[in-house]
C-alpha cells in the first residue's frame, strides 16, 4: 500500500465505473412511453442482485450529511450478499469512492482507490462484494437506496464487511 495521497476526483462515467458496478442515469437508456403518452419510462437502468442467502429487495431512504473537508479515507465497506444502489433525490453533486479487492480478497486494495464525481442526476449500483466508502455528500442530501434484507434471524453483519486502517490512506480535497 502506498502512503497518504490526494485522490484525483474524476467524472463518473459508465466505462470508468464498470468494474465496480453500474452507473444509473438516463443517458443511453431504453425509453418507453407509458400512461397514454404522458410519462417517459427510462427502462431497466440497473438490476438488483439480492437473492443470495434468501435475501429480498428493500427500498430505504438515507439522509446524508457532509463530512468536513478534506475528507480522510481510512475505512471501506462491502456487501458480499447483494448489490446496493444509491439514487439521489435532489439535484446535488456527490462523491463515490471505490477500490478493488486485494489479492486474497480480505481487504480493499488501496493502491487502486478511485474517487468519482457524480452529478445529482446520476446514481450508482455497487456490485456485490465491491469495496466502497460510505455515502459522501457535499451538502445535506437524501438518497433512495435499493439493497438487500436478509431472512428473519440473519444478523446485519452477514451482508456487511468493514475494513478500517489505523491512519488515513488518502484524502479528498474539495
Enumerate the language-model features and the residues they cover:
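Non-catalytic, conserved peripheral segments adjacent to functional cores
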Residues: 1-111, 115, 147-174
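His/acidic/aromatic-lined binding-pocket segments of jelly-roll/cupin-type domains
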Residues: 84-87, 123-124, 135
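Conserved metal-binding segment of the jelly-roll/cupin
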Residues: 117-131
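Solvent-exposed, flexible loop/coil residues
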Residues: 120, 135, 139, 164
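Ligand-binding loop in jelly-roll beta-barrel domains
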Residues: 129-144
